Design a protein with these regions (language model features):
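N-terminal hydrophobic/helix-forming segments and targeting peptides
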Residues: 1-145
């Protein structure tokens, strides 16, 4: 999530959920704004030049040392604001055999299976012998297991 718009126009982000900053560097992201849609960007180390930054390899990757890069004059014009969500590219692929590989599938896949099952019951006009409840929580995304 966007935690701060820095004076240079770059975004400081904060973690919501299980993404680790070690896995965020150089990843493509979309900033989902309140009114302006989605804005594409890239997460970079704050001092990302390996040729100039002598501590590049040893700099800890935390959400205080990586940022989403945008030019200063464009950030506000784009409608980006504190609290907007930053979504990492899941790099989803379906192989020729039908195998689905992607990041962040754990909860989404489970919800998709439950939705498909409910749709199947409806389409086939089937009624289970017992009452079935579909319950989805968001506790993992706010720090609960």
């Amino acid at each position: 999530m966007v935690a701060q718009i820095k004076g240079n126009g770059r975004l400081r982000i904060t973690n919501v959920g299980g993404m680790n900053a070690n896995n965020a560097e150089a990843e493509n992201v979309r900033v989902i704004t309140k009114f302006s849609g989605a804005i594409d960007g890239t997460v970079q180390l704050c001092d990302a030049s390996v040729h100039v930054n002598g501590n590049y390899s040893t700099t800890p990757r935390t959400f205080d040392t990586v940022e989403v890069v945008r030019s200063a004059e464009d950030v506000r014009k784009l409608g980006i604001d504190v609290g907007d969500f930053v979504c990492f590219d899941p790099r989803s692929r379906i192989t020729e055999s039908g195998y689905i590989k992607s990041r962040f599938l754990d909860d989404k896949l489970s919800v998709g299976i439950l939705q498909a099952f409910a749709q199947y019951l409806k389409d086939e006009n089937l009624t289970p012998k017992r009452r079935v409840y579909v319950h989805v929580t968001v506790y993992e995304e706010v720090g609960h297991g």
